[in-house]
């Protein structure tokens, strides 16, 4: 009898209710089974989830459900990264309080995530804007302050003039604010910093232990930490050019081997010498002010046009007093990096070459590529940055750059310049301390108090939390806390006199730098329960976008170490395994030059071409390129619409099946339709065969078609398990398609009453295996199918969500036959299929029975038959 169509709306709502009522996915910290902690980067509550969320959380859910089935005690929590500027912007634009806006969005997105059927432990849910969470963050801040890992200092900062707040270097992208897109300016402010540089060497060395991280991410962090071994060289100022009080410029370089190619020295706009020279020099003062309009990050410097101001001052070359180099103030040198001064070797650094060409400075190559002639070698528009041998370098000529480095260092270390060595070897790091002060309201208050008599001191622990006031106004840019009539006024905890609260709040990346530890015991009064944290950490599998490679992931690695120093955790690394998934992308569409939504168009196949028109008017629509889903280009697919039309399982299945998970997946209506048909096919095959299989005990077949069914199922169990372990979800999906194709004929026979007892036993086992393997990807369908089969696995009543992963029989997975290529006189003519354990005599006899061998021998006998075991057969005629 034909089964009714599978109704995902009814089934999904039912099974989600069953899981919730049974508290199926709540995790007990006291469970003695081996732990497995899987976590996807928690979302910012922007208002609605998008298909990127669906893909990210579907991947994590596959891992969580699979590991549960494999017998692990799985922690799979969810929360909300809820502080940040968008809430304040919404408050200004829509006249709604950030708290109200945020919690409304959380409610909407939680409903959406629940509709996906994710196996999350919602009992551990928190938002970083919950007072209970940021209370513990303030406790952590004070702990780190007392351990000397928090400092307050004046420094150049990146100022976002639109968001009116400070940005960390990592938050400046191509010279612009990462959220506002505004050109960033430099300002000098007193800020709070986490001393991440105390861990520079540890953070770098730790990358070598993270063998389950993508190499690309490790390389990005390695470059950002930026360890370099170089030489700090003192260049004496030429007589008669230096202002009073200045006698030298100290330069840090990683390429002292190229000193004989030097064409100039460049100093930062904030270098003491530059400041001195700007006194009474309007042109230089104006140039320095221009330099301050760009960001303070190295990324900002790399993208900005390279500019310099010739100071007229000269320095002497370290190896030749008669060789003088011009000194420029340059916009690509930062005071915070190295010594705030560099020497430029145009031939072997592209930035220096561009600068030299712009200001018509001499370009002298000093490293000769292999195979080039020193007499004719010259530099064009591209600097030579590879290895070679030294030329035009006097006593260094003929050396390798490495040997030249050591020779220069050795000589200058022994050279006295005014009572000190002219150079010293130095290790530098690109990494800078993490400035966390933000001039905004919607963030975690920094728990410090300023007193004119006592200085700056922490808020007493008994007075925590420092809560954000609700009665604030967002009628103009800037920080409402600065303008609050009462909140900022407080008594000094030391002298009892009038004092004021710190009105800066913490960078929101602080909130996400330790949330994974809080999930291990979110009910604790302390920031962590040390026993629970040490049990669950590190996170076994972390999933999220590669855009967080430097920001969130590096900060989290620092925070774990800092929390270890403060006694809150016992591990160094937060995430054992890291997976960075690709994006969900979609075609773009335009009508009359305006972007239009996929929901508003119709696409048809006409004369072999895809033609798009507007649904309402029939107007033609231009089909554009495939791009990341974005609201601005309207190529967004709403998960709510997909789930309403097809169901959550189909949305999950499609984003897992269409491409390798590390690559982008292209969302198409045709792909969703294909997934829908597959779901209906599985349901029809199982439901129609269920009456014949419901009361049958599962048992592997031993012969004929029943054995074939069992072999296919057991091979799939092994392969799909291996695929999920490797996070190769698309390969696992492909194997399930294959298994359904293999089982379909036999299941139809069972539905028609044509299967014998052995086939029924084999089919019952194979169908249970299919259902259990499908469950991590399509959990609702799996539960519905098992219920149709009587709700039992291996004879025991269970939910699929609580059922163990099927176990394959190794004997059924091994191939008993082998295919051997057969050559005649060294050329392949065909293949021989034979038992894997066949001996040499049997193989030789079987080869002689092959038609193409008989034809080649023409009734005669071969001179010999060479058998390479398990590899190949060669007949010598």
Swiss-Prot record:
A motif ('KMSKS' region) lies at residues 628-632. Coiled coil: none annotated. It comes from Brucella suis biovar 1 (strain 1330). A motif ('HIGH' region) lies at residues 43-53. Keywords: Aminoacyl-tRNA synthetase, ATP-binding, Cytoplasm, Ligase, Nucleotide-binding, Protein biosynthesis. It is found in: Cytoplasm. GO terms for cellular component: cytosol. Its main location: cytoplasm. It comes from the Bacteria. It catalyses: tRNA(Leu) + L-leucine + ATP = L-leucyl-tRNA(Leu) + AMP + diphosphate. Belongs to the class-I aminoacyl-tRNA synthetase family. ATP binds at residue 631. The gene is leuS. Its EC number is 6.1.1.4. InterPro entries: aa-tRNA-synth_I_CS, aa-tRNA-synth_Ia, Leu-tRNA-ligase, Leu_tRNA-synth_edit, M/V/L/I-tRNA-synth_anticd-bd, Methionyl/Leucyl_tRNA_Synth, Rossmann-like_a/b/a_fold, tRNAsynth_Ia_anticodon-bd. GO terms for biological process: leucyl-tRNA aminoacylation. GO terms for molecular function: aminoacyl-tRNA deacylase activity; ATP binding; leucine-tRNA ligase activity. This is Leucine--tRNA ligase. The keyword Protein biosynthesis applies. SUPFAM superfamilies: Anticodon-binding domain of a subclass of class I aminoacyl-tRNA synthetases (SSF47323), Nucleotidylyl transferase (SSF52374), ValRS/IleRS/LeuRS editing domain (SSF50677).
